Amino acid sequence: MSTIYFLPKAGAVAQSAIKMELPDTAKTWQFNKKIASPQELQALSADTQFSKAICLSARPDEYAANGNLIPDRIDLSIVLSGSDLNNSIHRPERCMPAQGHTILSSSNQKLRISSGRQFEVKRLVSVQSQQVAGVKKREEYVNYHCVTYYFFVGHDQITNDHLGRTLIDMKDRIIRG
């Protein structure tokens, strides 16, 4: 006796509403675009897309000892999931320790956008330790105090919850492709 299973053909993944192209500037912010690290490319599936930038905005009237303006910094990452749910996108708590972060706290925060709408984001407070470049006699590290906000965008829903993101993603892929 045999059994035949009829499975639908896998269709193309629906296009995302997320704009992956980052601007060069936004108000006082300068976007210095960067590529995904080899570790990110190795850890995530090949069809995962990245848009990344280090964004700097000089603080008015705040100068370093060398006379340069002191900037505020935002590390911006947009990661667009590929077809493999398990190896294409994940919550930052999974990869931040490999990037030198020690996560000190995690909480939910409301983010209000210019339209007046709001949604919940995850807020992580961490310390990132990075080796100082150019130091030859001994290893020297500098610590950065970081705040990370993240959320996941589905077809028509936003969530800051990993399980919620997985369920939204599965529903969107079944219904919308």
Predicted features and spans:
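Hydrophobic membrane-insertion alpha-helices, especially the h-region
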Residues: 1-4
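Alpha-helical transmembrane signal-anchor/signal-peptide segments
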Residues: 7-28
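Short extracytoplasmic
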Residues: 21-57
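A cross-kingdom signal targeting lumenal/periplasmic-facing segments of multi-pass membrane
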Residues: 49-177
